């Protein structure tokens, strides 16, 4: 059913398959959902320094960039979150909508789509707030999206630029999939990757994740 001008994508990473191969063989561009306020959910302690709060989302964006250096954001968070069953999360504070969108851009996103235009009044995702709230009126989030757009226009000269990393973290899918069944390996891998990320954030040292395969030079 694909017509001229259509493109195929997805909106997330899947830990039980080779995302790099999927992107190469099945997709025109790789997209991801960015919800940094997961760091502030009811099940998280926002005062825990080790969590790095919303900065921690850049760890996910680094993984996405390893799959597609110039990716897209299918759903960029614009409001409070939560299904009717879980994932309760607060609304972005003034300025955070722009901060989080710029976080995606800084990590290589060439396209940003905010979730969503207006908040739904029913169904499972009725607590996932969009740019407009239930009253469908202009608000500070809409003003901030407009301001974000104006800020982006100032970045025209660097649009399409490649992300420059100071070091790389090597991975491969066989070892990553092994963590799904090997509890010892899972705990060691989680702690190791977390400490590498924390060090890079504290010392402002950018890094890339590189997945090795049979075709790696």
Identify the meaning behind each predicted range.
Residues 1-6, 35-217:
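Carbohydrate-binding surfaces of carbohydrate-active enzymes
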Residues 10, 30, 168-170:
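Short, well-ordered beta-strand segments
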Residues 11-13, 211:
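Short loop/edge segments at beta-strand edges and connector loops
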Residues 16-25:
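Distinct, well-ordered alpha-helical segments
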Residues 25-30, 108:
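Glycine-enriched alpha-helix->loop->beta-strand junction motifs that scaffold or abut catalytic
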């Amino acid at each position: 059913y694909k017509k001229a001008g259509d493109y195929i994508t997805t909106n997330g990473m899947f830990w039980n398959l080779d995302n790099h191969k999927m992107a190469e063989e099945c997709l025109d561009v790789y997209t991801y959902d960015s919800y940094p306020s997961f760091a502030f959910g009811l099940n998280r302690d926002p005062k825990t320094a080790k969590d790095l709060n919303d900065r921690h989302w850049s760890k996910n964006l680094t993984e996405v960039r390893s799959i597609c250096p110039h990716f897209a954001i299918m759903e960029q968070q614009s409001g409070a979150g939560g299904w009717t069953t879980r994932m309760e999360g607060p609304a972005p504070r003034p300025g955070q909508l722009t901060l989080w969108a710029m976080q995606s851009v800084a990590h290589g996103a060439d396209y940003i789509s905010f979730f969503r235009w207006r908040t739904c009044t029913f169904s499972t995702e009725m607590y996932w707030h969009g740019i407009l709230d239930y009253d469908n009126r202009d608000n500070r989030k809409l003003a901030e999206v407009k301001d974000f757009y104006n800020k982006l226009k100032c970045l025209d000269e660097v649009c399409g630029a490649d992300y420059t990393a100071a070091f790389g973290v090597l991975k491969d899918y066989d070892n990553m999939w092994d963590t799904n069944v090997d509890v010892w390996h899972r705990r060691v891998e989680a702690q190791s990757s977390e400490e590498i990320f924390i060090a890079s954030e504290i010392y402002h040292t950018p890094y890339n994740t590189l997945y090795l395969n049979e075709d790696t030079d």
